[in-house]
Design a protein with these regions (language model features):
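Extended amphipathic alpha-helical segments with heptad-repeat/coiled-coil character used for oligomerization
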Residues: 167, 479-579
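Long, highly charged low-complexity segments enriched in Glu/Asp and Lys/Arg with interspersed Ser/Thr
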Residues: 579-615
Length: 640
């Protein structure tokens, strides 16, 4: 028997009983609260990206006030020029123009045909989940917050049982704050806060009428903060005002807290020398799987007269296993569902990537240029204020020049009138004539400062004018312009490759889920092309190990044009037939023309008159008397 306390789940059940979920909730809440700074930074970055750039708070006379309100109180207009949005759009354009997709390669070269099959199946699953759009939006999230999360799961959606991918909003996600490995391999706890309708809740967790009544009773009080506070205080976990983790913003929704964390228990690691399998088993199964099997092999060896030292026995060793265990919890500490990870990849369903995560710190792409954006907005607002405050068209009118019968108001009205005439009294000697004063106070260096900030903006972000598609200066060569765009792309290479590694990690879990849950033969077809129809056989592919790589997509117009040109050259040199040209090429008329050619061939083989053949040749075909006529018709079909 294992020592008491080795099995963490069994120990919690024994010592805490029905209250053990509160310990899990408390730990999850601490991780969620530890990400409060990240959530605030993300909100600030998002505000600057989408134009809300005067929402920072400043302290004036001991009172916190938003910058926008302060500027308005001073009688100014809080102007802004959103450069960050343009920068983010440029990087998103670069990402979409790459048009990359994950492909599978079998580690065993003899199983490479299975790698091609899995690549097709993976592409079909990506089309099902609209991954092109999901990854683009995840890339935007990655630029804004520096942290992106997806959830890979298997189940029912829209009456379809399949492998699904969901975007996870980082504000609803929490993770072990002790993690320092930027690969995420030292993570010990992850989770997500779900706000779902009561109908979705029952569809997921209610198996019968009793479950429905239990859920209705639980969530009847989930909107009452005082009831929640009293519940947690009774069990020694005071909330101290932190209700956001337990109470949804929309009180019509039902909150479910999903927690995945590492648990431990003693297990036995086995190595079957007979077939090379390495596996682990529970202590309770050791007798049946290892001891009895080894005794059986020894008995058979004795019956055959073999030496016991030559018998391939199952080798084993005792060890403490650290495994992923999940909890589906209510805000009141009810466990809706729990268990060891059901996935054969033996991990949690989440895929996440933080950037750059050196020493556990997250610094997003947008955060690097917020100071330049703020200073640019400040210069623009200051420029506008100076222009409005400077003297423009002020009339200096000496009192000695004021004629009889006119007041200064009359002079002002006449001055502002189109084609107005102002009469003046002849001034005395030394008295100046009325004159207009215009003071140009704008040339104080603001334009130079603004241009310098715009240049800093491009230098810091690495997104220059060439990358944004701006025209070059007069006389710039095309090679220099292309080189500038290439240099800018190089500065973004680390960011793009980091996101590609995130896509690869997600594709790896997709492949593992497909191998596990696609347990019946299926036929897959991508975009209706006959050449990409594959049959998925789970018996052959289930145990194949695949390497994944991110390569250029074959669905881009440039790739299709290159393929068509190569096929046309091969066809002109009679290296391939017209049927092969139409099958492997990408022509808008390929399917119809190929079907027509096959139909004509069948008519020829049956001795019928195909369309498009001269009457003389048709008569010879019908008589089936001239073999050269058949050959001539075949040549006509190949030349068409």
């Amino acid at each position: 028997m294992p020592h008491e306390g080795m099995d963490s789940v069994a120990t919690a059940k024994h010592t805490l009983g029905g209250n053990r979920a509160f310990e899990v909730l408390w730990q999850a809440q601490q991780y969620w609260l530890a990400m409060d700074t990240f959530r605030r930074d993300r909100e600030r970055n998002k505000n600057y990206t989408y134009g809300r750039q005067w929402d920072d708070y400043v302290c004036v006379n001991g009172r916190k006030i938003r910058e926008e309100e302060l500027i308005k109180k001073q009688g100014n207009v809080p102007l802004k020029n959103n450069l960050i949005r343009r920068m983010v759009q440029a990087v998103l354009g670069i990402y979409r123009s790459q048009a990359k997709e994950p492909t599978c390669t079998a580690r065993d070269r003899d199983e490479q045909r299975y790698g091609e099959t899995m690549s097709t199946v993976l592409q079909c699953n990506m089309q099902l989940n609209r991954m092109t759009e999901i990854n683009a939006r995840c890339m935007e999230e990655f630029l804004i917050s520096g942290f992106v999360v997806q959830r890979k799961w298997y189940g029912w959606r829209e009456n379809k049982l399949d492998c699904w991918t969901d975007y996870v909003q980082p504000n609803n996600f929490f993770i072990d704050n002790n993690m320092k490995d930027f690969r995420g391999w030292d993570c010990s706890c992850v989770g997500e806060v779900h706000d779902i309708s009561f109908e979705e809740l029952c569809g997921r967790f209610a198996k019968d009428g009793n479950d429905y009544n239990r859920l209705a009773e639980i969530y009847k009080f989930a909107k009452d903060k005082s009831y929640l506070s009293a519940t947690f205080d009774n069990f020694g976990y005071p909330l101290q005002g932190y209700y956001d983790f337990l109470v949804p913003y929309d009180t019509s929704r039902c909150r479910v807290i999903e927690v995945w964390r590492k648990e431990s228990k003693p297990r036995v690691r086995c190595h079957d020398v007979n077939n090379g399998d390495v596996f682990k088993i529970d202590i309770e199964d050791f007798q049946a799987i290892v001891t009895d099997e080894n005794n059986k092999r020894l008995q058979e060896a004795r019956e055959l007269g073999m030496d016991e030292s030559d018998v391939p026995l199952i080798r084993w060793e005792w060890f403490m296993d650290s495994y992923w265990y999940y909890y589906m919890l209510t805000p009141f500490g009810d466990i809706l569902e729990e268990g060891e990870t059901p996935y054969e990849h033996k991990s949690h369903p989440y895929v996440f990537k933080a950037y750059p995560f050196i020493d556990g710190e997250i610094h997003s792409f947008v955060s690097n240029v917020i100071d330049q954006q703020r200073y640019t907005n400040r210069l623009i607002t200051m420029y506008d204020w100076i222009m409005r405050a400077s003297a423009k068209g002020v009339l200096l009118f000496p009192e000695d020049c004021l004629p009889k019968g006119m007041s200064m108001d009359d002079v002002a009205d006449e001055w502002a009138r189109f084609n107005g005439i102002i009469m003046i009294r002849t001034p005395k000697a030394g008295t100046p004539l009325p004159q207009q004063i215009a003071n140009n106070c704008t040339q104080i260096g603001i334009s130079e400062l603004l241009n310098m900030q715009l240049k800093f903006f491009e230098d810091i972000s690495g997104v220059n004018g060439a990358l944004q598609g701006k025209p070059g200066y007069s006389g710039m060569s095309a090679s220099l312009y292309n080189q500038q765009a290439q240099n800018a792309s190089t500065s973004l290479l680390d960011l793009l490759d980091t996101f590609s590694s995130f896509v690869k990690e997600g594709a790896y879990k997709d492949v593992k889920n497909i191998q596990q849950f696609y347990d019946t033969p299926r036929v897959f077809n991508i975009a209706g092309k006959n050449s990409t129809i594959v049959e998925y056989d789970p018996k052959k592919i289930r145990d194949v190990e695949f390497d994944l790589s991110i390569v250029e997509s074959t669905a881009t117009p440039a790739y299709r044009a290159l393929t068509n040109d190569m096929l046309m050259q091969l066809w002109e040199k009679n290296a391939i037939s017209v049927e092969q040209l139409l099958e492997h090429g990408d022509f808008p008329f390929a399917d119809e023309l190929l079907q027509s050619i096959k139909s004509q061939r069948e008519q020829l083989e049956q001795g019928k008159v195909p369309d498009g053949i001269s009457p003389e040749l048709a008569q010879q075909v019908q008589q089936n008397a001239n073999a050269s006529a058949m050959q001539q018709a075949q040549q006509m079909l190949q030349a068409s």
